[in-house]
Regions:
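Phosphate/NTP-binding elements of NTP-utilizing enzymes
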Residues: 1-200
């Protein structure tokens, strides 16, 4: 991506985020923090981040949202945190303990990690099951379309590959996603998490 293309992407993101700022903040404030940082500090981010944010906002305008599932994923990872008057965050309850330098501890997701989880879990689409209305009972996630077919509300993102730089808790986040699918996710889900050292 050339510098000119990055500037065009930045201008486009600035424009679309201004229209969707309230919608994004209502989903999760850290999602808004990440997207706003892309706009205010574009030199700290690469062009693919800008394009990914533009695409996410377009998908958010186009498809159904499943904020409940997204918030469940975030809660199971980190639990509930509270910010003190001094600005420090303290863990209150819930969430999983993760391996840390001083033993098992709770971690709060960073804004870019919240964006990753939102892209995976927040968007849903109506999919034609190729069954006609009346051919069977409807499941709780289904409805009858205007064409007389049964449609099911499913996650839009069904395949996801995460590439991030070193020291961004990618192995920990990937392992958590596997855990979430095992405990709460779709049946027959397949998740693969690779690390380059056995102690990870």
């Amino acid at each position: 991506m050339t510098q000119e293309e990055k500037q065009q992407a930045h201008a486009m993101l600035t424009d679309v985020l201004s229209d969707q700022c309230e919608q994004v903040a209502a989903i999760e404030p850290r999602l808004d923090d990440y997207l706003s940082d892309l706009v205010t500090n574009p030199d700290n981010h690469n062009g693919n981040e800008l394009l990914g944010a533009i695409k996410f906002l377009r998908l958010l305008r186009t498809y159904e949202t499943d904020i409940e599932t997204f918030r469940d994923v975030v809660y199971k990872y980190e639990g509930i945190w509270q910010q003190t008057d001094g600005g420090m965050w303290h863990h209150i309850e819930g969430g999983l303990k993760h391996p840390g330098t001083t033993g098992p501890t709770y971690y709060r997701l960073q804004p870019f990690q919240v964006f990753v989880l939102a892209a995976m879990f927040c968007l849903k689409a109506w999919v034609n099951t190729e069954n006609e209305a009346g051919s069977r009972e409807l499941l709780p996630t289904e409805r009858i379309g205007s064409d007389g077919m049964i449609y099911d509300l499913r996650r839009l993102c069904t395949e996801f590959t995460l590439f991030t730089p070193r020291k961004t808790a990618k192995t920990q986040l990937s392992a958590f996603i596997q855990f979430w699918y095992f405990m709460s996710g779709d049946e027959n889900a397949e998740c693969y998490c690779c690390a380059n050292a056995s102690d990870q």
